[in-house]
Amino acid sequence: MKNWIIIIPLVLLSSCRWVKTKEEQKSKELQEMNAPNIEQENFIHADKFSSRIDYFNWMMLDPQEMKDSTASNVKRIYQHILAENEYTDAKFYVLQDLKSELTEEFNSFQSMDGENSQFVQGEFKYYFEYTSESSYPEIYRSSAENEGQKELIFDFNKIGVDFNYFQIGEVLISPNNQYIAYSADTTGSQKFFISIYDISKNLTQKTSIKKCDGQIIWGSDSRSIYFIESTKNNGKRTSSVYQYHFLESGINKEKLIDTQLQEGFWTIERSKSGRFIFIYLHNNNTVTTFFIDLQRNQKPVLFKEPEKGVRYILGHQKEHFIIKTNQNSSDNFRLFKSKISDFQRSDKWEVLVGHREDVVIEKMDIFEKFIVLEEKVDGLEKFHILNSENGLGHYAEFQEETYSARLVNNNDYYAEYFTYQYSSLSTPPSIFLYEFESRKNNLIQRSEPNSDFDEDDFKTERIWATSFDGTKIPVSLIYKKNVSLDGKAPIFIEYEGSYGNTKELSFKPERFSLLERGFVCAIAHLRGGGYLGEKWHSEGMKLRKVRSVMDLEYSIRHLINNEYGSAEKVFISANGANALIAGTLVNNHPEMIRGAIFKNPGFDLLTRLLNEENINRNEIEEWGNPEIEEQYFYIKSYSPYENIHSAYFPSIFIQCDLNSTKTKFWESLKWVARVREKMTSSNKILVHTNLNKKASSQDKTVALEKKAEQFAFLISLLD
């Protein structure tokens, strides 16, 4: 027996060593795997003003064409995608433990409270809630008088589980509180169907609406909805506004406005009062506005003849329209009041808020007695409250250096208060109720992270970097207070710089996995974004687009020169068309970046803009028109795919979705192929294409796993 007691541990030890050796051998083999061999074909883009050689054009195929799995070119592209995915998976093999560790951190930190929302509509209070296991919301409601008796009335998780891809567009309760209308995309094509759920009968009515853009508006009768449907006609994308009636006598679908001869896109909204529907055609920086008076059951009425570059946004209060407009070169917008009966006489409009050079009117919320304006001063939100009865106004302001505040869930036209969400880079999101008369600020909901989090451990600040032309570029920062600002910390930088968008300066639980590892996290607010208003946007558009790239470069240099972090540890992240800015920077100054992570990046800009089947007017307005010679060559001078040279490229990881409708999967694949061809470094250049398996960004489990992959990749580069 004694001999066996000795032998068994020896056998087990030998077995463990064998398993470990086998695991190490597998890991070694995977790390030594070479990148896929990529075929090259001579293809010449015969553009109007020049020719371009493109050896990887064979990868370019529309996602809809990829559905024909029998076509030889489709098989070829799929084989390449699978080879790239296998190569990426091999390189991530050694990062499995780190990825799992990060996923656990995200889940332990994540609080679903921040995702939840609630609002009162008539006699009911509604709750949209998530659980730690759910990807989609559950809808509850209670009597507005007795909030303790909540009843589950709809669960999107029971619907989403039946689809590989499920993205909710819009969810709206009917005015009579009897129906839920929702839109959803189950293919990733951004074509949404609409269903109507009868709460009392527990019955879903599927409509004939299969290809709308996701927007829904209820009519005041609770028996009709308004939506927008897009089609293609001779290669041109067109959109139309429809009304869909589901009456006892049958169903009727009626086209209200047709844009067959116009470009742009539609948005629709219902006034808080319930009387009007406002319809906006956004085209070439111009907004053409229509309204429907539901009391009179009228057809759409044109508010004003379109004027190039002029926008009219409407609200309703009693017998007046409230008008937000940038007419007469008011880039930051003014606010007017007009009698509904005399709206065409702009000379009779009453000025409520004049134009101010340093204040941007972002949004307005109209109540029976008050108007709340969401304004921006130096990039930070403030709420301007106007008393419509006495004409007096006051502000609700905030004290942090950098934060995010926005109006939310204000559905009651007769309310004596408004609600808003407040968050910052270090402050979890909270919902406040602000009383108009007393000016009291009441906390009604706060998201609490599930870990031992103390916001006092972190420092947030806003600094101003000087760009190449002397322009001051705002940069928002967060880091742990115990991090020494001695030029040694790793820097993780994000940014906005396109389409006038602004990156919300809110609490992101996953960011704290980097902060706890000593990162300084930065968000640069570049020209081309909307942080400082419309003028800031226009300063980084079209023939000024390179300014966005220069702003990013100089923001990074400012951080390094002021010892916020190390020049050898700069990491960058960007998504979609906005990633073009970082892609151009990587081309121009690869030595500045240690590692980059991208999601669906728009790197082949020139080819995309010249593709008439998929381009839309907004992209032309933002980047320029390649059919104009000066703009063509300007775009060609910085478009990332056209400007890859022999260089020491950093490590790069790209995630893309096969069904991405805005920036195409082939933009990532082509760019990676060309970079590998030109790079002089041995750094990893990885691309992984999601083949539509639970790809929706609303699937929180998948979204966190993807983020964990990205961060594992970056953190591994510090070793």
Where are these regions (language model features)?
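Extended hydrophobic-aromatic, low-complexity segments
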Residues: 288, 313, 332-334, 344-349, ...
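Active-site-proximal cap/loop segments of hydrolase catalytic domains
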Residues: 526-719
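Hydrophobic/aromatic beta-strand patches that form the interior of the parallel beta-sheet core
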Residues: 126, 226, 493, 522, ...
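Beta-propeller folds
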Residues: 7, 16-417, 423-429, 433-434, ...
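Sec-dependent N-terminal signal peptides
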Residues: 4-12
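Conserved structured core elements
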Residues: 174, 188-191, 219, 268-271, ...
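Glycine-rich His-Gly loop
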Residues: 130, 326, 423, 494-500, ...
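Cap/lid segment of the alpha/beta-hydrolase catalytic domain
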Residues: 157-171, 183-188, 203, 436-440, ...
